[in-house]
C-alpha cells in the first residue's frame, strides 16, 4: 500500500453475536489500522468479511505478522462473545499512533445519517469522520451495546477521513407511529 505494508485478511465463519466487535477489538489491540473492509452476512448465517489492514510502524516481517494474525485471530474467534467483552486496550505491539497534523488542523466534522432501506426491513447508517485509532472498534461496541445487528458494511479510509456505510437492523431501530 502507499502508506506501508499491509495485510488482506479474510474471515469466513458461522455468524455469532458480537463477532464484528471481536474482530475489530483484535485489530485495535494489535494496532492494526483497518483501511478497507467489506462485511457480509449470508442468509444462511455465515459471516464473510474481508479487511485490508496496515501494520504499525516498526513491524518489519510481513510473513511473520500474517502468520501471527492468522493464528491469534482464529483463537479469538473461537468465542467471539468473550473476546468482545474484553476491555479495549491502549497499546498493541507497537503502541498507538498519534493523530496526524493534517487531521488536527483540518478535522472532518463527524456526521452520521440513518435512513431506512427501500423495503424498511433494515437501516443504512453512513458515518463520516476524522480517522483515529480504535474508531471502528468503538462503533462496533456501540452496535453490540444496543443489540444492533450488522448485516453488511463497507469501510473506507481515505487518508485521515473515514467513510463507512453499515446496513443494520435490530429491535432498537423499530419505530411505531403513535
Map each language-model feature to its residues.
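C-terminal accessory/binding modules appended to enzymatic or scaffolding proteins
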Residues: 1-34, 95-153, 163
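A cross-kingdom feature marking solvent-exposed beta-strand/loop segments within repeated
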Residues: 17-20, 34-37, 45-50, 57-61, ...
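A short, glycine/Asx- and small/polar-enriched loop/turn
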Residues: 5, 44-49, 160-163
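C-terminal, non-catalytic macromolecule-binding modules
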Residues: 53-109
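Structured core of small recognition/catalytic domains
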Residues: 149, 154, 158-173
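Short beta-strand-to-loop capping motifs
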Residues: 11-15, 53-56, 127-129, 168-172
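Conserved small/polar residues in nucleotide/adenosyl-binding loops
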Residues: 175-178
Amino acid at each position: 500500500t502507499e502508506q506501508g505494508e499491509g495485510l488482506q485478511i479474510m474471515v469466513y465463519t458461522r455468524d455469532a453475536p458480537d463477532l464484528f466487535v471481536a474482530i475489530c477489538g483484535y485489530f485495535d489491540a494489535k494496532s492494526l489500522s483497518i483501511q478497507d473492509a467489506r462485511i457480509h452476512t449470508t442468509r444462511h448465517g455465515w459471516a464473510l468479511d474481508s479487511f485490508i489492514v496496515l501494520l504499525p510502524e516498526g513491524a518489519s516481517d510481513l510473513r511473520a505478522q500474517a502468520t501471527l494474525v492468522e493464528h491469534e485471530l482464529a483463537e479469538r474467534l473461537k468465542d467471539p462473545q468473550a473476546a468482545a467483552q474484553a476491555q479495549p486496550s491502549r497499546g498493541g505491539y507497537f503502541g498507538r499512533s498519534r493523530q496526524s497534523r493534517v487531521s488536527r488542523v483540518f478535522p472532518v466534522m463527524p456526521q452520521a445519517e440513518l435512513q431506512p432501506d427501500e423495503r424498511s426491513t433494515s437501516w443504512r447508517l453512513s458515518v463520516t469522520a476524522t480517522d483515529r485509532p480504535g474508531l471502528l472498534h468503538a462503533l462496533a461496541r456501540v452496535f453490540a451495546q444496543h443489540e444492533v445487528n450488522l448485516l453488511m458494511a463497507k469501510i473506507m479510509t481515505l487518508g485521515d477521513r473515514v467513510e463507512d456505510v453499515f446496513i443494520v437492523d435490530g429491535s432498537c431501530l423499530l419505530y411505531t407511529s403513535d
